[in-house]
């Protein structure tokens, strides 16, 4: 059967076994609940142990700067190519041209990942001379000659899988001469000002063959693709942490409720035991008092009878019993009063 006090006993695997003592049944054993808690704890440890490692690997695989191109139109010169600085695209230079009227710079920014998907952002910078009704005649009378110095600082988000290929294009736009009187007569806004504009620069995309991008090895791209970005790893850790917190809270709640129930049950059992002992003492004292006064005779202990009314019969034996003759009434007792003479039994040599 095994020793129920031993933690190796197979009966301890079952919590609702009727023949186990309550103290042994309530002891801490390796159950499904404890295994689940250990699994959750191990999952939590693995998640937060691998999270800094993945960050370090991605930081080593990602180059310090990604390539980008600036596509400018005719009569435009760029003093400095764009580059990445602290995760943001920073570009500045001089725009030289011969044009009249206010200037609107339109910037198209494309973010291309390793899968070929593009994330395009468009910015309209109209602060170089957004006209109003008061100064539009003055702006039309004078031509803007020379250069316009510009500086762009564009903050972009992370691309898919952490791999980027930027493409920048700049266009210069100015209102046509035919639309000047229409702008004077109607309500003017910068948005309406952009619509009749004519682009001076070209807006052609850079062919795929001329795109500048960092060289990634197949292994690093595969590792980054498996990681699916830092967001998935971060949210996985958050979800595991939330699951572990819920499991720990549920475990503490069950322990608190079970402790309260056990305390109440033990107190009830102790009170019931005291009540039963008091009743037995009173019943025994009442019975002894009745026996001492002679009102009640002390009962004799009953002999235990056979169950199911089975008659007592001797078990059959293979050896035949020796049948002795009945003793004679006048014969002396079988037990001698004096020991026999040993000399007659054992003669001397």
Swiss-Prot record:
Gene: US30
Domain of life: Viruses
Region feature Disordered, mapped onto this chain: 328-349
Annotated source species: Human cytomegalovirus (strain AD169)
Biased composition (Pro residues): 328-339
Protein name: Uncharacterized protein HHRF5
A Pfam family of this chain: US30
């Amino acid at each position: 059967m095994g020793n129920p006090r031993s933690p190796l006993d197979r009966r301890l695997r079952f919590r609702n076994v009727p023949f186990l003592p309550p103290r042994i049944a309530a002891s801490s054993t390796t159950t499904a609940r404890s295994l689940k808690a250990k699994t959750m704890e191990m999952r939590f440890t693995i998640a937060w142990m691998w999270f800094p490692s993945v960050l370090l690997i991605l930081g080593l695989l990602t180059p310090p700067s990604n390539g980008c191109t600036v596509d400018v139109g005719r009569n435009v010169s760029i003093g400095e190519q764009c580059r990445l600085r602290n995760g943001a695209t920073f570009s500045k230079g001089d725009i030289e041209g011969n044009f009249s009227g206010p200037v609107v710079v339109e910037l198209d920014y494309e973010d291309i990942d390793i899968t070929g998907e593009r994330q395009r952002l468009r910015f309209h910078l109209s602060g170089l001379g957004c006209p109003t009704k008061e100064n539009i005649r003055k702006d039309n009378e004078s031509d803007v000659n020379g250069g316009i110095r510009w500086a762009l600082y564009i903050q972009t988000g992370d691309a898919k899988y952490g791999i980027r290929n930027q493409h920048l294009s700049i266009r210069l736009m100015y209102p046509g001469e035919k639309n000047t009187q229409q702008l004077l007569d109607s309500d003017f806004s910068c948005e309406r000002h952009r619509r009749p504009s004519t682009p001076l620069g070209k807006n052609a995309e850079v062919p795929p063959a001329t795109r500048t991008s960092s060289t990634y090895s197949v292994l690093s791209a595969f590792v980054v693709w498996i990681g699916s970005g830092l967001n998935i790893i971060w949210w996985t850790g958050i979800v595991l942490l939330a699951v572990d917190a819920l499991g720990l809270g549920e475990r503490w709640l069950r322990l608190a409720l079970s402790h309260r129930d056990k305390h109440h049950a033990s107190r009830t059992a102790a009170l019931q035991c005291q009540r039963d002992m008091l009743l037995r003492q009173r019943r025994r004292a009442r019975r002894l008092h009745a026996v001492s006064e002679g009102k009640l005779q002390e009962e004799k202990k009953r002999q235990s009878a056979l169950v199911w009314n089975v008659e007592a019969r001797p078990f059959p034996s293979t050896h035949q019993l020796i049948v002795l003759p009945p003793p004679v009434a006048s014969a002396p007792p079988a037990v001698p009063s004096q020991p026999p003479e040993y000399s007659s039994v054992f003669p001397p040599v």
